Amino acid sequence: MNSDIVEVATIGRCVGLKGYLKLHNKSDFPEQFKKGATFFDKNDDQLIIKDYNRQKELVLFEKFDDLDLAKTLVNKTIYTTKELTRKNCKLKKDEFFQFDIIGLKVVENGEILGIVEDIQDNFANSLLYIKTDEVLIAAGKPKNFYIPYLERFIESVNLDSGEILVKGARDILENS
């Protein structure tokens, strides 16, 4: 799949007789789900929201507004693009889209520790999954490790230079 694509939700079971579906949001931006918003599935079929109930997380798509048609969407994953995400989702100061963080170099005191390969969210905070730099792997360090996305470990994120400056992450690597 195209690297410009962002997974945003999975469509769940039908609710009621009018074609409403349970929407399992996988993004941090529920505001993107609104009347008229356009998404697509893995076959590039367009899905336009006709109605959305944020409290109940129920969605009704245009052209799928009866039970039989809606059933064809159950268990589908829906996507958007990075461009549309940037347009429709507003970030606060010092916030970043996960897709912008993935692929950045992790640097501590001038040493490249690795590259962010994934981000895992848990109840407490996000964890950066780091693929350890080949030089460190050759020196006997683990192939990967996690860094909590917390102020005490993250000094700065610079998208222009493609780096996350960290502190204390080398200790995490050493003890992984």
From Swiss-Prot:
Decide whether keyword rRNA processing is in the record. Answer: yes
One example GO MF annotation: ribosome binding
Q: What is its main location?
A: cytoplasm
Q: Kindly state which keywords UniProt assigns to this record, in alphabetical order.
A: Chaperone, Cytoplasm, Ribosome biogenesis, rRNA processing
TM ranges = none
Span of domain PRC barrel? 93-172
InterPro entries according to UniProt: PRC_barrel-like_sf, PRC_RimM, RimM, RimM_N, RimM_N_sf, Transl_B-barrel_sf
Signal sequence coordinates = none
GO biological process annotation, one example: ribosomal small subunit biogenesis
Q: Which GO terms describe its cellular component?
A: cytoplasm; ribosome
Q: Where does the record place it? A: Cytoplasm
| Role of this protein | An accessory protein needed during the final step in the assembly of 30S ribosomal subunit, possibly for assembly of the head region. Essential for efficient processing of 16S rRNA. May be needed both before and after RbfA during the maturation of 16S rRNA. It has affinity for free ribosomal 30S subunits but not for 70S ribosomes.
Assembly: Binds ribosomal protein uS19.
Q: Its family?
A: Belongs to the RimM family.
Q: Which NCBIfam families match?
A: 16S_RimM
- How does the entry describe the domains? The PRC barrel domain binds ribosomal protein uS19.
The entry's protein name is: Ribosome maturation factor RimM
Provenance organism = Campylobacter concisus (strain 13826)
Lineage of the source organism?
Bacteria, Pseudomonadati, Campylobacterota, Epsilonproteobacteria, Campylobacterales
